[in-house]
């Protein structure tokens, strides 16, 4: 079976936005118009095709990014729907990593909201070309131009409208296409599914001319040949303008802006036309680079079926019918179902059982998958998110995906003995699906501790345990992931000697411990001269310190951001062993940390509250009482936006408190920002509580 769709006609796109800007609705409409769904799923009826986990349908938010294939004309469009809630940024990161382009959906009333900024920064990091779709143009307070201004000011992007709205709010009835200079009017009877072209309305003619000039000036700056024609007063053809907009978009010089109302079926076809016209195919983006697993040198893989196979796994999902599904993006070559691949990240051989093309929650079995495509495989045992798949004879490791450290933890315990076994297995499954979720056992209490990116994140995980895995569990109160660090430089000795009958033990070291700047982590330096500690025992000292630093001296939290130099020591010909030096290392660390002015660190969250003017004072007073620092305030669409830095420990239950203080009219978002030293009085309380 040969390739059905050529590479230049393939688009891999993501749809990204703030919660409730209308992301899933937009995706639903795309699936409807491309003929994949016969009945449109409404998010607020809980029937959207893309939101297929029960929790998503209940909460009306998208949690897992479902990958779906659809056709528009002769183009294949693979869409990855990404969640907008900040607890799930990890999902957004991993989908952006494997996309070629994205559609950023903004609400015409709210404009650029805090989460939009986070997602936009992630897309900048992976250099993903974008189109902006200003949605909900039929809502009261809709303002297309304010939206464009906010994209410029808040996201520091270069938005260029290629459409203008005709009317707004309840009079929104069409758009002016600035590339072809014509009006597109929605047909009310067919729910906007049909539209007709018309002359540009007289009252908009002048404005349309002005914006078209702006569009041409903007794209001509990136294209010398166009600039010459334009300055010479020649008319540019539609094709020339389209080609120039495409080039500038792919080079991330501009971000074309279009508008519509997905819920009212308006403008979705134009959005699809723009995706095909302006977003890159796998051939338009640079060849992916990786490391040759044999030689360690950098190599590239071009988007071509003739190159060796290479793919990146970007999502693991448990499907009730086929078991574990692994979603992957093929960068080069061809993969057949039933064949063997090599997981170069884990250095394991894997067999591809079946290959599936996913459509939100239906699946179609395929025989092979080609360069530039996205598919799911069944039967992979070892592969997890961020792993590379390739042939064993030409192994490559593609750049992996980095995952943030979790900041909030809760203890979870099974209700019955029968639940105990299920709990362990279920948690491992969930952790393999979501790398920002961690599971560990507390050595002192024997409790199972799960940690994640926020309260909602953990709430949904506990919910899935009960529903999907049928595990009954009790959940403790959320705990903050504190850290410890040191503030002074010290030099100490660690000596472990045991000489009573039989073979003795002897390990002796001197270490220097000093603080490093925040975020630097742990560093070990071997500064031994003249072999006073033999080379083979040095890694054991390092290991001893690493084990000891997991439980800090103040309150048992992991110690971070310090440097240890092994400077001196001694050994015994017969009695020294790795074990003895490991114990000496850990003894030295414990003593050094206690003398080096240990302090507690706590996660500080960046909080943004959108609040009506009249509740502003209460909200600020409340944030101050939570040890918050107000960073700034600005007006936005009839409300005030307060940004603050607040310790996570003070933010538990904030959603409920904020709701009652503002009669449910304020909303907030919270993301982890950095770790900071805990004030002395608070620190003493925490230590006293731990030592009890």
UniProtKB/Swiss-Prot annotation:
GO biological process: ribosome disassembly
One GO molecular-function entry: GTP binding
Family matches, as SMART domains: EFG_C, EFG_IV
SUPFAM superfamilies cross-referenced by the UniProt entry: EF-G C-terminal domain-like, P-loop containing nucleoside triphosphate hydrolases, Ribosomal protein S5 domain 2-like, Translation proteins
Domain tr-type G, first and last residues per copy: 8-283
InterPro entries per record: EFG_II, EFG_III, EFG_III/V, EFG_IV, EFG_V, EFG_V-like, EFTu-like_2, G_TR_CS
Domain of life of the source: Bacteria
Entry GO terms, CC: cytoplasm
UniProt-annotated binding residues for GTP: 17-24, 81-85, 135-138
UniProt keyword list: Cytoplasm, Elongation factor, GTP-binding, Nucleotide-binding, Protein biosynthesis
UniProt xrefs under Pfam families: EFG_C, EFG_III, EFG_IV, GTP_EFTU, GTP_EFTU_D2
Gene3D superfamilies per the UniProt record, alphabetical: 3.30.230.10, 3.30.70.240, Elongation Factor G (Translational Gtpase), domain 3 (3.30.70.870), P-loop containing nucleotide triphosphate hydrolases (3.40.50.300), Translation factors (2.40.30.10)
Subcellular location: Cytoplasm
Role played: Catalyzes the GTP-dependent ribosomal translocation step during translation elongation. During this step, the ribosome changes from the pre-translocational (PRE) to the post-translocational (POST) state as the newly formed A-site-bound peptidyl-tRNA and P-site-bound deacylated tRNA move to the P and E sites, respectively. Catalyzes the coordinated movement of the two tRNA molecules, the mRNA and conformational changes in the ribosome.
Family: Belongs to the TRAFAC class translation factor GTPase superfamily. Classic translation factor GTPase family. EF-G/EF-2 subfamily.
NCBIfam families: EF-G, PRK12740.1-3, PRK12740.1-5, small_GTP
Protein name as annotated: Elongation factor G 2
Lineage: Bacteria, Pseudomonadati, Thermodesulfobacteriota, Desulfuromonadia, Geobacterales
Gene behind this protein: fusA2
